[in-house]
């Protein structure tokens, strides 16, 4: 039906007759002529309809926004005075010789010239996606997927599919379950990742695997999460963690160069402990210059239990953030930051303004200064390298609360005070994660997943002191977002059984849930390691947006609903009966 895309017309086509298909972006009647801005996925071009072409002019006079149309015409170069530098096709226009209305459009539920609610945009997503801004994002995501496949193919990785209907395994989030009609009362689980199958592929001899695959997690949603998401899944045999990081870093480095013409440089490597100590996060945004500074040793003897209590508690932490120029913050602003850290469990936010650094103790203003002697204040000023006009903000509590609260405050201050360099790219690797973490009841859980190999210890050593063991795991972080995570996997049954035992999975349960894996580990399993990227997050960063829904064609809401199709919905009673399922609906409470 067409010979060219609208957005691809240029001066090299001058004098040629072309056929275009697309939509009316805008119509203008000017000086007896009709001007149509015609749009398709590649861009917009101006079409001129002359009244001398009576049949075409008559049809063009009926056009309204979003009519689906076909134009035939001659490409001509615009006079210099009429060149539109804001359009990629602004040097040319199409002089129409033929016009067909393929389909008319009803009045639009969205207005392209103003901001529409996200609810409306998701309900009429097929219209929202026509907007050049959205179309460009989806196209860039497609280019990213194409680049990944090409890069991995060239590096001898094999694209192998794994099952979607599989067995439920504990991977951190709730599973989406699918009832079996044949095996009544039994359920499949949709995969949270292809983790075990890709490990089995390594055992099968396919030493370099990848897959761009849909995964499913029934978890609470945030702006950068969806119940179904796309993963770039990678697994290798006979590669060390460093070698896996090398090839996947090169993938991202080359992707940024090809798609954005951005040179990322070599990624720095940071241990988990350093990331938590300096930034209060295992995914630090290095574009933000603010850091957490520990001062527990300086305040452990002060007569102020808010500080001395956590300072003398082995599970406590006292940390500060020095904010350059922050002494200008009002008391109201400081109180608002105090309320903010309260979201993360902090009981308050002590502060100290440095009005005159040269005056030392006499030059600070703080409601807690009276509890701190001159020596302590001067030591804090020295350690934080404070200067006149700065403010020092204090966090004191359990280490986990301080790290999370002050880490979040660091990010908020970076945004509010425009300290974060939003024009920069700051990738890094975070490594040497703890193997396990404690829940509130003293039980151990795998920090990544239970198939991650410990770093440099035997099964016996791990069992003797699991709480201090590190894992051979690594996360790739870009601008404060974890875009990929991976690890070396356990490749012998003894170690895997030991890890299951530490996690409280008894022998019987191990066989029920993971018997196939433990059996497979007996037959010459190679050492293997891998990584999975979140394609949605990578695309989000590439497109310069902060909402993952902006780079997914048909996303769900934060309530895991599809406003376009009204999913999820009630099932047909006959289908439920065939599956031997009875649904118990929550009773509605009287108002």
UniProtKB/Swiss-Prot annotation:
EC number(s) recorded for this UniProt protein: 6.1.1.12
Classification via CDD domains: AspRS_core, EcAspRS_like_N
UniProt GO MF annotations: aspartate-tRNA ligase activity; ATP binding; nucleic acid binding
Binding site for L-aspartate: 171, 217, 448, 489
Annotated residues for binding of ATP: 217-219, 226, 482, 534-537
Entry keyword annotation includes Protein biosynthesis: yes
GO-annotated cellular components: cytoplasm
Catalysed reaction equations from the record: tRNA(Asp) + L-aspartate + ATP = L-aspartyl-tRNA(Asp) + AMP + diphosphate
UniProt keyword Oxidoreductase present: no
Enzyme superclass (EC): ligase
Subcellular localization(s) per the UniProt record: Cytoplasm
Keyword terms of this UniProt record: Aminoacyl-tRNA synthetase, ATP-binding, Cytoplasm, Ligase, Nucleotide-binding, Protein biosynthesis
Aspartate: annotated segments: 195-198
UniProt cross-references to Pfam families, sorted A to Z: GAD (PF02938), tRNA-synt_2 (PF00152), tRNA_anti-codon (PF01336)
Entry's family note: Belongs to the class-II aminoacyl-tRNA synthetase family. Type 1 subfamily.
HAMAP family named in the record: Asp_tRNA_synth_type1
Quaternary assembly: Homodimer.
Function: Catalyzes the attachment of L-aspartate to tRNA(Asp) in a two-step reaction: L-aspartate is first activated by ATP to form Asp-AMP and then transferred to the acceptor end of tRNA(Asp).
Name of the protein described by the UniProt record: Aspartate--tRNA ligase
Organism (species): Aliivibrio fischeri (strain ATCC 700601 / ES114)
Higher taxonomy: Bacteria, Pseudomonadati, Pseudomonadota, Gammaproteobacteria, Vibrionales
